[in-house]
Amino acid sequence: IKNAQYRYIDHLASFIPSKTKTILDVGCGIGGNTSFLLKKGYSLEALSPDSYQKSVIKEKFNRDVTFHHCKFENFKPETLFDLIFESESVCYIDIDKGFKKAREALKEGGYLLASDYFVFFKDHSNSLHFKSSHDMDTYLNSAKENGFNLIKQYDQTENTMLTLDYANYFIERFI
């Protein structure tokens, strides 16, 4: 799974525009993506409302990364960013408030790179995926209404399903 995570962030990083220097990692977790992007030479700030993640980030990066302990919707940017990076954190952000905050935190001509799982269909399912994801059409419409233009859309499903299926098999068999 660790190798799959590395391939995933490496793939996401390929979408970062070449002129990007400053990145805000929204929903940074314990800093895997932050660490990867720092090694690529970007200037990073990280954000999470989680206290445990705050302690890990502070210990892991010391003063190399400014950490913002808040929800993205409540973030008060002191600087503007070339790119806002949301990897597997989109589903925790209120759609309209998130786009408004992204607009506020980005430099003119800045980018929002959002990667998460979205609901593409309405099957009235009770699955956790259905309950914890944003509807893709609603998300894209809000992006447009908030002045964002879709540059690239990529469906990662085929590349991730084998890993997810294996993890599910492992859990069901051994746990």
Locate each region found by the language model.
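Conserved alpha-helix/loop element of class I SAM-dependent methyltransferases that forms part
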Residues: 2-19
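Class I SAM-dependent methyltransferase SAM/SAH-binding core
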Residues: 24, 28-73
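A short acidic, Gly/Pro-enriched loop at the edge of an enzyme's catalytic core
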Residues: 74-84
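A short SAM/SAH-binding and catalytic strip from SAM-dependent methyltransferases
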Residues: 83-95
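A short glycine-rich, Lys/Arg-flanked "PGG" loop and its adjoining helix->strand segment in the class I
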Residues: 96-111
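Conserved class I S-adenosyl-L-methionine
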Residues: 113-138
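Short alpha-helix
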Residues: 132-150
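Conserved catalytic loop of SAM-dependent methyltransferase domains
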Residues: 152-175
